[in-house]
Regions:
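Glycine-rich phosphate-binding loops of nucleotide-dependent enzymes
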Residues: 2-247
């Protein structure tokens, strides 16, 4: 039997990152354990997207450490990081608009270098999760609805066989019913496949219900953390992110 694995899958320590002289991250500490869903919430401009992008090396960390699976990846080039089975669905989806759904999914699979049978297994899994995509395999990405594009962005990330999936605002701009489908899919991936997820959301209510733990970021710093349930109960969270906010 191997020793219990107490080391987080992703450990971020004292992370700083800047755009020119704008300091977007000012010493962030955040852990994601294997098998967890962790939500990162915070107002516009807090630095949430920057945190995710810094894991991929763009922008580069100016100080602090990013440790993934025990490996210091703080200064690793972006193309190396994609091969470490970390996948990202960035804010604004960024699918390939001129490519078909099938081609978009293939782009994700190319990162994984899986065998033919692994690819077809992964494709089945994505199309079972998002049957909508199955009906639209030959349609251009750019002509999909917002919800379908989000499904495609997540599907493409899944095709790279990630251990850690980072999602930046997957529910942004989606009707509540479609947003719920996306959150349900994330829950299924976590529960069935043990996928580890770091999710950035302004929809704090949904995100904290979905997540095992959450962090609140204000102005480049983590100001609060706890279980999803604990954070949902906190009056300052309710006031800032739930009551009267985007639900
Ligand atoms: N490419 C860039 N160049 C200069 N400043 C940037 C750039 N990207 C982000 N910033 C600044 O860094 C800060 C953090 O931005 P970031 O996009 O990480 O916030 P966020 O929490 O994801 O916000 P939102 O909820 O609006 O997506 C903001 O002040 C933003 O203006
Ligand atoms: Mg953002």
């Amino acid at each position: 039997m191997s020793a219990p694995d107490t080391q987080p899958l992703l450990a971020i320590r004292g992370l700083h990152a800047a755009y020119g002289n704008i300091e977007a991250l000012k010493g962030v500490d955040l852990d994601v354990a294997a098998g967890e869903i962790v939500a990162l919430i915070g107002a516009n401009g807090a630095g949430k997207s920057t945190l995710m992008m810094t894991v991929f090396g763009k922008p580069r960390a100016s100080d602090g450490e990013i440790i993934y699976d025990g490996l210091d990846i703080t200064h690793a080039p972006t193309h190396h990081i994609a091969h470490l089975r970390i996948a990202q669905s960035p804010e604004g989806r960024r699918i390939f608009a001129r490519m078909s759904v099938a081609e978009n999914l293939r782009m994700g699979a190319d990162v994984a270098h899986g065998s033919k049978s692994e690819r077809s297994e992964d494709l089945d899994r994505v199309l079972t999760l998002f049957p909508r995509l199955k009906e639209r395999m030959h349609q251009r990405g750019g002509t999909l609805s917002g919800g379908e594009q989000q499904m495609l962005a997540i599907g493409r990330a899944l095709m790279s066989r990630p251990r850690l999936l980072m999602l930046d605002e997957p529910s942004l701009g989606l009707a509540p019913l479609i947003a719920r489908q996306i959150f349900d899919a994330i829950r299924i991936l976590n529960q069935k496949d043990g996928l580890t997820v770091l999710i950035v959301e302004q929809n704090a209510n949904h995100a904290l219900k979905l997540a095992h733990r959450g962090y609140v970021m204000v102005n480049g710093l983590i100001t609060l953390s706890g279980t999803g349930a604990e954070l949902l109960e906190r009056p300052e969270i309710r006031a800032a992110y739930l009551e009267g906010g985007r639900h």
